């Protein structure tokens, strides 16, 4: 596990949600957490005993492959991050869920958790996370590859300091490409970097030559969320229509339009550098050796950790 403090995950999804006018308020039935009926269940998850706090809420952030190798109805989620926001204490917790985690799926059977969305869109992804982790999700925000590119370009790029270079000779050349199954070489050097939307996507998406494998990518994704948050502080309600046009409906969310203004105002109050916990489920919380290159969860360790922060 990596547990760190910072400032930013909360405000990442707020501008994304606020400018998703064309896809805002999509109805998604979010059931209460419950054990899945399966004769081969590895465990029976129970809802967290953490008490509900007035005004607090949990959002599932989903970042998808939506490039030309996939149809719009069958995309994987390269990124799944639970965000818990407690306005009364200005506390935020971000939990990165490994995309290769081998779990029971809400639609039936077992598979990598990144496939849940492809079988049943947001409702299936939400139900799978709820049922395995025993948490209650209030809302979701989904963003595709082009959506991330356009969002970051619309706010003028982001600034990060990379601790290690990202060098990938097998990065998919599948965004706006005539040859979606080809590869290209990408590089993001170590040190201070100003990233455009395309280079930021390369930074968070690359999964080759990282000594920490997919866990390193999870840490990079959270780092980019923090950088987006820095730029998002400059966004005012008057900027939202132009940003919405730039995204061109490439964000989907269950957060209704009438909530966005109050949420943007709330986000501006989260300026404490210690306001957010960042959690990545490194070994021994997970371990390799699962079917098809998946990783296995150690629920005896994961669930107590998750239920410290997520009801």
Feature roles, as predicted:
Residues 3-311:
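Non-catalytic, solvent-exposed segments at the cell envelope interface
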């Amino acid at each position: 596990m990596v547990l760190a403090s910072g400032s930013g995950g909360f405000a990442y999804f707020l501008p994304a949600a606020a400018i998703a006018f064309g896809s805002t308020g999509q109805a998604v039935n979010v059931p209460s957490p419950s054990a899945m009926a399966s004769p081969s269940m590895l465990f029976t998850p129970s809802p967290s005993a953490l008490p509900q706090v007035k005004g607090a809420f949990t959002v599932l952030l989903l970042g998808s492959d939506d490039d030309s190798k996939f149809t719009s109805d069958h995309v994987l989620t390269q990124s799944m991050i639970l965000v818990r926001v407690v306005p009364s204490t200005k506390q935020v917790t971000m939990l990165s869920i490994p995309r290769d985690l081998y779990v029971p799926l809400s639609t039936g059977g077992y598979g990598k958790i990144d496939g849940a969305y492809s079988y049943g869109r947001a409702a299936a992804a939400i139900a799978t996370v709820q049922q395995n982790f025993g948490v209650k999700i209030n809302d979701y925000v989904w963003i595709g590859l082009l959506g991330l590119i356009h969002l970051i370009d619309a706010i003028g790029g982001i600034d990060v300091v990379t601790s290690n270079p990202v060098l990938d000779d097998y990065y998919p050349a599948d965004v706006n490409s005539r040859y979606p199954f080809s590869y290209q070489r990408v590089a993001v050097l170590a040190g201070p970097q100003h990233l455009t939307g395309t280079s930021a996507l390369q930074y968070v998406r690359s999964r080759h030559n990282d000594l920490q494998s997919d866990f390193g990518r999870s840490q990079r994704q959270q780092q980019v969320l923090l950088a987006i948050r820095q730029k998002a502080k400059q966004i005012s309600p008057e900027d939202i229509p132009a940003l919405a046009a730039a995204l061109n409906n490439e964000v989907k969310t269950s957060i209704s339009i009438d909530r966005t203004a109050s949420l943007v105002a709330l986000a501006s109050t989260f300026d404490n550098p210690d306001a957010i916990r960042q959690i990545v489920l490194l070994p021994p919380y997970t371990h390799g050796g699962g079917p098809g290159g998946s990783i296995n969860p150690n629920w005896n360790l994961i669930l107590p950790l998750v239920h410290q922060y997520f009801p």
